[in-house]
Amino acid sequence: MVIPYVIEQTARGERVYDIYSRLLKDRIIFLGTPIDAQVANVVVAQLLFLDAQNPNQEIKLYINSPGGEVDAGLAIYDTMQFVRAPVSTIVIGMAASMAAVILAAGEKGRRYALPHAKVMIHQPWGGVRGTASDIAIQAQEILKAKKLLNEILAKHTGQPLEKVEKDTDRDYYLSAQEALEYGLIDQVVTREEA
């Protein structure tokens, strides 16, 4: 992946930043890849850094992700709930699967979608191999993750748990407006407010 750089002119001369470092300077985190342990560790570190810098100032988390590993996503989710700084979430493009959970977990009143963004929720999935005992253990873990993620979505959307369970049984796609009506976001925005 090519990472763009920006050159900033200051009174002391020029400063070169990779684009993600420059965005971080403005308290912006961009989650634009599938979520795995490595990606989660970077996002968690950025959240902790920005919270330590100023726990009263908003952190903006922009999301364009197909989702990914449940444990990695839960590390981001838990950190968002742990930090004192309010974390706003903005979906651009797509927030699917675990990324949809992260979107919904933003500070209430600060969860946004751009007009043509999509959100997709579903139950966790996984493939297993091994002995019958190992397969049984993995099946139990997936069922536990399914229950937990449905409870998290119900908590943040205000939807009844039974509805979330039904809706996540298969891939459930929502437009930005439908995500608003579902309670996954609080507003569809067309322009960033100053």
From Swiss-Prot:
Name under which the protein is recorded: ATP-dependent Clp protease proteolytic subunit
The organism's place on the tree of life at top rank: Bacteria
UniProt key word Protease: yes
Enzyme Commission number, as recorded: 3.4.21.92
Catalytic residue positions: S97 (nucleophile), H122
Coiled coil: none
Main function: Cleaves peptides in various proteins in a process that requires ATP hydrolysis. Has a chymotrypsin-like activity. Plays a major role in the degradation of misfolded proteins.
UniProt-listed InterPro entries: ClpP, ClpP/crotonase-like_dom_sf, ClpP/TepA, ClpP_His_AS, ClpP_Ser_AS
Gene3D superfamilies named among the record's database cross-references: 2-enoyl-CoA Hydratase, Chain A, domain 1
Subunit and interaction comment: Fourteen ClpP subunits assemble into 2 heptameric rings which stack back to back to give a disk-like structure with a central cavity, resembling the structure of eukaryotic proteasomes.
Family: Belongs to the peptidase S14 family.
Gene Ontology MF annotations: ATP-dependent peptidase activity; ATPase binding; serine-type endopeptidase activity
Subcellular compartments: Cytoplasm
